[in-house]
Amino acid sequence: MELDFGHFDERDKASRNMRGSRMNGLPSPTHSAHCSFYRTRTLQALSNEKKAKKVRFYRNGDRYFKGIVYAVSSDRFRSFDALLADLTRSLSDNINLLQGVRYIYTIDGSRKIGSMDELEEGESYVCSSDNFFKKVEYTKNVNPNWSVNVKTSANMKAPQSLASSNSAQARENKDFVRPKLVTIIRSGVKPRKAVRVLLNKKTAHSFEQVLTDITEAIKLETGVVKKLYTLDGKQVTCLHDFFGDDDVFIACGPEKFRYAQDDFSLDENECRVMKGNPSATAGPKASPTPQKTSAKSPGPMRRSKSPADSGNDQDANGTSSSQLSTPKSKQSPISTPTSPGSLRKHKDLYLPLSLDDSDSLGDSM
């Protein structure tokens, strides 16, 4: 006996066709609008969690610190304690953060931050070692356009204007620079060391560079030259001050400079260095005295002149006038005025006469 199951096959076929049409024509639950919205919201939340927040941190009580920008994210810092530890390595010093970063405050100190979720994009915060906020104007030393919310066009224009201003300033600075020989006197107990420094467009590029050259030349006992003063007591603050009417400057180190009248007054030796021949007084060595030069020079000078001329010349202060008119006098072929020995003697003789014997020259004329 055979059973006929044809009607069951037709019913199963119909049900299979209905399921197939439902799968092909109608969207599955995973592709529904609700699931698509849920998946998009989850991705946005995940991206917001992964996105780093750029914030700036300051030291508590440090008004000269410009702050440090951090990119805070959950991938970089697994916990708030990890952020505190990293800030300790970056900001810890021996003055303001002795015990590291233990607390984070808002920039006005009104609220204490307890987790990374409380940090907001583009805001500034203060790191502290103790539970005490020091109210200081932290943001006064920072460019207000540092925030990431500022448009890129503004950021691109700022460096261009800064570069153009710097180039214009550099061109302006080069206009007043001219060859000039200045005298630098070391501050302190007299006798003081004095050196001469040549300033021109090749040696005077900036005020800091000139201070470095003066430091190497003057060699202060306290180290680096920090301040320069004119003889009137005015402090030199820029490169332009070197090319004014003043030629003499007092170099001071890190020590506190005392404004005493004796510090700005020059003694006889320092005046001799100033009024002497620049080529002969380029270093700290003192010029020879008139007595020593007059004692060494009369011998060869008398042999080069006739007795009648030598008797008429020795009339003023025991100094022979032949020393002043040597190029005009008739010399023997042995000692010519163009020989190196005679030029060296003339340089030594002319230097003190321009300082001490000005009266005698006026009488002899």
From Swiss-Prot:
Location of Phosphotyrosine modifications: 70
PROSITE patterns for this protein: DC
Region (Disordered): 275-365
Chief site of localization: cytoplasm
Effect of residue 115 to A: Impairs phosphorylation by MARK1 and PKA
Compositionally biased residues, Acidic residues: 356-365
UniProt modified residues of type Phosphoserine: 28, 47, 74, 90, 110, 115, 265, 287, 294, 297, 306, 332, 339, 342, 354, 360
Tagged with keyword ATP-binding: no
Stored SUPFAM superfamilies: Doublecortin (DC)
Cited InterPro entries: DCX_chordates (IPR017302), Doublecortin_dom (IPR003533), Doublecortin_dom_sf (IPR036572)
Keywords carried by this UniProt record: Cell projection, Cytoplasm, Developmental protein, Differentiation, Microtubule, Neurogenesis, Phosphoprotein, Repeat, Ubl conjugation
Effect of residue 47 to A: Impairs phosphorylation by MARK1 and PKA
Modified residues (Phosphothreonine): 289, 326, 336
Subunit organization: Interacts with tubulin. Interacts with USP9X.
Described purpose of this protein according to its UniProt entry: Microtubule-associated protein required for initial steps of neuronal dispersion and cortex lamination during cerebral cortex development. May act by competing with the putative neuronal protein kinase DCLK1 in binding to a target protein. May in that way participate in a signaling pathway that is crucial for neuronal interaction before and during migration, possibly as part of a calcium ion-dependent signal transduction pathway. May participate along with PAFAH1B1/LIS-1 in a distinct overlapping signaling pathway that promotes neuronal migration.
Protein name in the entry: Neuronal migration protein doublecortin
Species: Rattus norvegicus
